[in-house]
Amino acid sequence: MEEVLDILVVGAGPTGLACAIEAVLGNFSVLVVEKGCLVNSLFSYPPGMTFFTTRERLEIGNIPFNSVNVKPTRAEALEYYRGVTESYHLPVHYQERVVGVAGTDGNFEVHANTADGEQKCYRARKVVVATGYYDIPNLIGIPGEDLPKVSHYYGEAHAFYQRKVAVIGGANSAAIAALDLFRHGAQVTIIHAEAELSRHIKYWIRPDIENRIKEGSIRAYMESTVKEITPDSIWFENAQGERTRIENDYVYALTGYHPDFDFLRHIGVEVDPRTSRPNCNTKTRQSNVPGIYLAGVVISGRHTNEIFIENGRFHGKQIIADISKHLGARPSKNRGGEQTDPSQ
């Protein structure tokens, strides 16, 4: 007979891994299913990125994050989460996208498609959705947004030396990208719909970007909305309705991201039409669908600046505590005196 897992976790980001660790510590059988690679969103960050937070706030599973820097780098974070996954022997299936969840509490069927088109089905008593939000950008919805020269994800600046680059947006990621591009010799223009840059820009970045704009090193058009992108230009309109065209080689539309609301609705989770917040118990993290739990930024709707790794990593404890009440205690799976918790 096909194995029935106690818990299936959708998503192998830091929050999903933290949930899987709590399941292991509770002696539950668990599987993590991930559409990409381990901590896929972190892997997609710019290669030279440094986190804004300290290493202690990225730790999961009581395993110390050893870093030579107070604020760790992307490379250090990738190494850390690989190490955590190995330490807890977490079972993770990669390149499998979960496309549906059928059944009822205690008897779910989780359907997934592999990268090469194979269809898989897993059975699980409980399901935890920790899919993050970085995969779905907030589209502007204008002509030309689908051109090859437009990207919603910032990478490296070198390729844009002496090129005309527009950065759409005024939040933290837009400010960082604009500064990096400028320092690598690009001709940078910021186009932002609001009158001022976002208040969420980090305090040590704000003076830098504001001074570069003030001195004219980076052009900025505030209260301006992009209307069209063409192969060699970008059109935008200011608050007075005046249209402007500037020559352009590349566009970074850094207008934010959001969770996969369609997937949540597809598996039966109610999503508030106004805030896009899913129906989720704040104490247990269980959704309106009994047996389906939500963890991490996926519960924040469009308010994605509320939940980060720093606080989402604790959702696993809440979830497994509630699952334990329903499934009961599990006997220890330690073998040969080996510790289940590698941090011990």
Label for each model-derived stretch:
Residues 1-10, 25, 40, 44, ...:
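FAD-binding core/adjacent interface of flavoenzyme oxidoreductases
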Residues 2, 12-90, 175, 179-204, ...:
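Beta1-alpha1 glycine-rich phosphate/pyrophosphate-binding loop at the start
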Residues 23, 45-49, 107, 141-145, ...:
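Short, glycine/charged-enriched secondary-structure capping and boundary segments
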Residues 89-112, 121-124, 183-275, 331-341:
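A Rossmann-like FAD-binding core segment of flavoenzymes
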Residues 137-138, 198, 261-262, 302-303:
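Glycine/Thr-rich phosphate-binding loops of Rossmann-like dinucleotide-binding domains
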Residues 344:
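Iron-sulfur (Fe-S) cluster-binding modules
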